[in-house]
């Protein structure tokens, strides 16, 4: 079968037999490699290469927006099995913009046959050996993988797009020139990656089934750049998402809620859990000191601590209140009311919130509508997410013990119920933190009473966020995953991915953390940063507070911070009050290493841009 060539701004050469591809422009070349070719994975886990297709046709095609190649594949067969799958693969060059679209269209398939389709295969920047090569990945805040990195790296949590290892649906590679790959059909997609020592990283999208079939068109958009770095990639993604999803800035969110305006420049302070109660099956259960499995900090005790912080000079704060429910932190969700009786109950909780308001502070409740505890009063397994094979998510890691996953289709009514009960008791927190929703991967449910696609899961999570906002509260959740940013005011954390790497035993000291997320979304959401060295999610030798300054964020403080942390917190929150509504327009490393960095914030004319030059460690 002959090769197909098409395109003018970008010249594409496709081999329909192998699906090898080459892109050429006036400034660079990008190509797949013969050792990585397309395939799909069936529901039993068997990997079936596209070469197993007994039916294959290819045509060149022209349309109003550009030129394309279409390859039709069917009749897939292995020694064990025949497959009903028939697909159309289309590669189109948009002549106006020079973008390249890779589109997968299912034409025929059987339910429950295909788990993932892995196409297109990885692309690499060709030539340009004089320049050092990098791959940019939106792992939490962002990460660069140098081509010459001596460490091996592969997925350690989940490869699903819009979860911790890929919070934004894109990646990019560059030397002098480079490319950005935008996963437009992000709801049912994974980003597979593998870096071997001293080699360019291999990244590719995997299109996952939705409710048992591929079901709909999947699109990957590739943009090519003559000069490229991580800032160029982030800004190109920002421009794309602004055009398709829009960017809701903090200024717009503050118009909808005066409490968001008060949140700007406020330190985020974690209270100790009002009640920490741990079930014996939990991995947090303390076998050597059983008394630590049931510890109380009364509402009045926390109120006294708040007054001490005010006396020490903390002028603006948002208190994240853990363990306020009847059995404390991560227990009995979603049936957490009434407020913890052992800590003083509803009356004492009202006093605590009144104290926070009197001191000029904001309050927010740590809440949860995903982890569904078997000990919850209203627990019914029929309300839990049911997987494709009929099984349930099962976990007993957290203090509340055994749990399932509450189907997100049902979550909004639990929120309405719980906050109505709190209002009836005179308890009106300024905000609510809905745990897990913006951090864990999108989920499906196969229970016919509340079937849910991953896209519907994202929509229902956003409905929960907007329900909190409609009550006049600050909306908060865990991480900065793409579907949710426009619906959130505050993240609990969005640092670098080191904390999860440490837990997983991944040792990659030669990766380079970069603020990809902040370059896209800085003026759209408030992000707190831990202060000290070895802070949560910061590089081993770096000061977390300095990364906070670089990113123009706010402080994450413990309930009894030292004086140095308080001083740094005041500096950081003052900076945040200056740059909170300004796009982060640039980031660079100063000198030969990575310890000295500079970010740049745009400001409205006639004022001049602000530079934050930061040395991370000495």
Segments (PLM) and residue ranges:
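Short C-terminal domain-edge/linker segments immediately following a structured domain
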Residues: 132-139, 148-150, 349-352, 395-398, ...
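Aromatic-lined carbohydrate-binding/catalytic grooves of carbohydrate-active enzymes
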Residues: 265-420, 424-432, 438-450
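Active-site-proximal substrate-binding groove within the catalytic cores of carbohydrate-active enzymes
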Residues: 14-17, 21-25, 177, 189, ...
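Short, surface-exposed, charged/polar-biased interaction segments
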Residues: 125, 135-140, 258, 323, ...
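Carbohydrate-recognition beta-sandwich/jelly-roll modules
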Residues: 2-319, 324, 341-343, 355, ...
